[in-house]
Amino acid sequence: MADSAVPCSLGPSTRASSTHRDATGTKQTRALKRGDASKRQAELEAAIQRKVEFERKAVRIVEQLLEENITEEFLKECGMFITPAHYSDVVDERSIIKLCGYPLCQKKLGVIPKQKYRISTKTNKVYDITERKSFCSNFCYRASKFFETQIPKTPVWVREEERPPDFQLLKKGQSGSSGEVVQFFRDAVTAADVDGSGALEAQCDPASSSSWSERASDEEEQGFVSSLLPGNRPKAVDTRPQPHTKSSIMRKKAAQNVDSKEGEQTVSEVTEQLDNCRLDSQEKVATCKRPLKKESTQISSPGPLCDRFNTSAISEHKHGVSQVTLVGISKKSAEHFRSKFAKSNPGSGSASGLVHVRPEVAKANLLRVLSDTLTEWKTEETLKFLYGQNHDSVCLKPSSASEPDEELDEDDISCDPGSCGPALSQAQNTLDATLPFRGSDTAIKPLPSYESLKKETEMLNLRVREFYRGRCVLNEDTTKSQDSKESVLQRDPSFPLIDSSSQNQIRRRIVLEKLSKVLPGLLGPLQITMGDIYTELKNLIQTFRLSNRNIIHKPVEWTLIAVVLLLLLTPILGIQKHSPKNVVFTQFIATLLTELHLKFEDLEKLTMIFRTSC
């Protein structure tokens, strides 16, 4: 019992001491937590102040970069204390104050375009010029982008322990870009693109490996579309570098094996052809000559595939196997030239290669078109206007003017029917039997005059009109006795056609407009103006027989037509043949004909058309 009573008496004091110790430990823990919290808060405040200082420094650098005189060393030093976002702010702020966005450039911005995109006809691409508007040139845009990509993207307050980057600046003379390329879609690579010859040319050409920004350095744009004239047109392939796959590598190896086998076969074939060729047989030499030249290029180039393709392409171009001409014209013009060349060279087939019109053929076509046009234009009224009423005595007969003088041969000498043989006399008898008359006994009737034919035509028209009107019936006796003027008065008055509705008036106006564009350059040597010749020219054109086909000509053809008409009108204008004005004009025309690869005899043939009777 005693042993059990002692611990019971000590229990309350022990509990009190343990409670005191717990309270003391709690106070110490709270004190430590308060100290740690204040320390952490101080560290956090220091870190925030440090971040703020770095941000303030970056903002001050942005403000300094808005100035005009910025050196390369200062720009490189600033790159360590700013981020790409700060640099884009520099570009925006400089563009707002009308300065170039590149800090090293001191130029002012000119007229800023309002559009968002720009279409390049040279590279056939669409560029987004939203960022490009902030720069004065493509070089500044690319140099700015080149520097921006080197700026670290990490926060500025953690770069103290990092190694500063070595900034590089774009040098002058390197090309720039027009903006970011807008990718609408991406074409899938097909087997035809891989096997096409265009891909080989793209791989062989070292200039094609340059980036799109270097190819867009030229500021000038081409206003035309390149087109290919008849020939073997290569396929349009995608020249962008494609990733090398396993299948493509296998295809390349197979192609190399095939090329090596073809090379061995080519060597054997050439040796056989050389054995067959002999100096005494010209035909064999001619047959062996062309394939020998064609295949020698394949033997002499055992190098890479690119060199073999280039040499074979050059040899094929020389021998006309695959000749293609690149012309800077539009697609519509290319189709027009194809049709023109096809008409001028009807005998050339599809295998003729390059379409080339010889100067002789072009000259003959030009003279033929002008001769047909002037012949269709000429009327009886034209000859009366140029030479008066007695133009028959001035003009030549069509037979004497059109047919050249030929020398008489022995066969052309007339002979008697008996001496020429029975065959000729029999042929003449059969010819006389088929004719409605025989011999020259029949009297030749005189041709009616132009005035009588004109009067009869007017009377016939009058009779037809009166008959359909039903007003009166004219007998033949009365119509013959009446005068033409009185018959015209009996008809109802008719209003003339409106100029806009008359086809002849429209055609005459078109011809006058075309000639008015060409004549001022030809009237200088004659020292006369367009007003001095306009009345006579208009009266001459009114006598022409114009249609919807003979008034369509090229500028060169209109020039020659104007020269012909001017030569016809010089006597009417009072310019003497041997006057100083006419001599200068003749020299000018001779120079013009030389430029057109024509002769003065060709011009004489054209003017001779108006010196022959209809």
Swiss-Prot record:
Zn(2+) binds at C100, C105, C136, C140. Its EC number is 3.1.3.16. Keywords: Acetylation, Coiled coil, Cytoplasm, Hydrolase, Metal-binding, Nucleus, Phosphoprotein, Protein phosphatase, Transcription, Transcription regulation, Zinc, Zinc-finger. One of its GO terms (cellular component) is transcription preinitiation complex. InterPro entries: Rtr1/RPAP2 (IPR039693), Rtr1/RPAP2_dom (IPR007308), Rtr1/RPAP2_sf (IPR038534). Residues 1-38, 200-266 are annotated as: Disordered. GO terms for molecular function: protein serine/threonine phosphatase activity; RNA polymerase core enzyme binding; RNA polymerase II CTD heptapeptide repeat phosphatase activity; zinc ion binding. A zinc finger (RTR1-type) spans 77-160. It is found in: Cytoplasm; Nucleus. Residues 41-68 form a coiled coil. Pfam families: RPAP2_Rtr1 (PF04181). Associates with the RNA polymerase II complex. Interacts with transcribing RNA polymerase II phosphorylated on 'Ser-7' on CTD. Belongs to the RPAP2 family. This is Putative RNA polymerase II subunit B1 CTD phosphatase Rpap2.
